[in-house]
Amino acid sequence: YASTGIYVDLPSVSEDRAEISVRGTLVNRDVRRAVLKLDVEVLDTDGKTVAQSLRSVRIDADGAFAFEERLQLEKPQLWSPDSPYLYSVKVSLKDVRGKVLKDEPRVPLGVRWFSVDAQEGFKLNGEPLKLMGACRHQDQMPMGIALSDEMHRRDMQLLKDMGVNFV
């Protein structure tokens, strides 16, 4: 599957704090060593930086550098089916003057935790949640599987109207 090459995990989440792990590999295909700044930011829905890691990296000529940055997010806005809040994790490579090189990949991030217990069932963010599931096939006549965004949104709204919270 295609991806940005940026991997985001949540090793620890609570109502008070979320620990965010951001991993990736930087590759230098140049014949010279690269001295760069790696900037990892967590942005809220307004684009405001709410957590950041900034450090210098050196990558040898025709070399690679694997990184893992750990960020702390205080009092995170938790994701849930009723409040599907998404942060955005942005990774930038900058030259020594601070100019952004190439692209700045962004990865959506929903901060949440869950647990499953035989007696208490499924909990999302510490609250019981009854999973109401359905299967969805993404096809419609005469489009086949080439659905527009509007068609996908309509399908999701129909599922939500049916009480589905798990697809």
Named regions from a protein language model:
Residues Y1-V167:
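Secreted/periplasmic carbohydrate-active enzymes, especially glycoside hydrolases
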